[in-house]
Curated annotation (Swiss-Prot):
Name by which UniProt lists this protein: Putative lipoprotein LpqT
Gene3D superfamilies: Mog1/PsbP, alpha/beta/alpha sandwich
Signal peptide start-end: 1-23
Keywords, in A-Z order: Cell membrane, Lipoprotein, Membrane, Palmitate, Signal
Locations listed in the record: Cell membrane
GO cellular component: plasma membrane
Organism from which the protein derives: Mycobacterium leprae (strain TN)
Family annotation (InterPro entries): Lipoprotein_LpqN/LpqT-like
Lipidation (S-diacylglycerol cysteine): 24
Lineage top rank: taxon: Bacteria
Lipid linkage positions (N-palmitoyl cysteine): 24
């Protein structure tokens, strides 16, 4: 089994971050706020953020990456908007599904892991958004820990600085459970990344992917 690596995705590289969305219906973000570097967060927490992969490792949970379409008893998929196409790179595992438009940005990255170990999904998901707080000049636009199709889920959306660019990212993590008798648990992550100054122009496609994202029993 392997350590779980999650990421806020660029087409050429993966950096650790977890970001996600709302349960039923998607709240349209205020894209005019994306370029700002001041945080919208008004409350503070005494708990230091613990990146989700680090938390899973600390409780003895490991994962094997699997193709999103291969989960028995579950449907995991995203739509491909017009003008988008599959993206491949030698550094990307074959189980990773990536679609992109016009090259590097915008991109959507879908990954799934078969989990091993004893854990409480409701506790694990509490750390689903922690990674985002560690990014340079991260500005939160939206956040949720509401269930997604009945499964534990975490969502965060925002913008941050990376390699001299301002990026906008939407990310959802879902922990679905397959049917009996095995009731196998998985971790599914969808991350959509665009240049912040193009987020408004790309918003229709991004929202179409968000609305069409499926994690549900067959």
């Amino acid at each position: 089994m392997q350590a779980i690596r999650l990421g806020l995705h660029t087409a050429a590289a993966v950096v650790t971050l977890s970001i996600s969305a709302v349960s039923c219906g998607t709240k349209t973000p205020d894209y005019q706020l994306i370029l700002s570097k001041s945080s919208t967060t008004t409350t503070t927490t005494p708990d230091k953020p613990i990146p989700l992969p680090q938390y899973l490792e600390s409780i003895g949970v490991t994962g094997q990456q699997v193709a999103p379409s291969s989960l028995p008893g579950l449907t995991v998929s995203i739509p491909t908007p017009p003008g988008w196409s599959p993206y491949s790179n030698p550094n990307i595992t074959p189980e990773t599904l990536i679609i992109a438009k016009s090259g590097k940005y915008p991109t959507a990255r879908l990954v799934a892991f078969k989990l091993r170990g004893d854990f409480d999904p409701t506790q694990v998901i509490k750390h689903g958004n922690d990674d985002a707080q560690l990014f340079e000049n991260f500005r939160q636009l939206d956040v949720s820990t509401a269930n997604y199709n009945g499964f534990p889920s975490a969502m965060i959306q925002g913008s941050y600085d990376l390699e001299g660019r301002r990026l906008h990212a939407w990310n959802r993590i879902v922990i679905p459970t397959g049917p009996p008798p095995s009731k196998q648990q998985y971790l599914v992550q969808l991350t959509i990344t665009s240049l912040a100054n193009e987020a408004v122009a790309q918003s229709n496609d991004i929202e179409a992917i968000i609305r069409g994202f499926v994690v549900a029993p067959k």
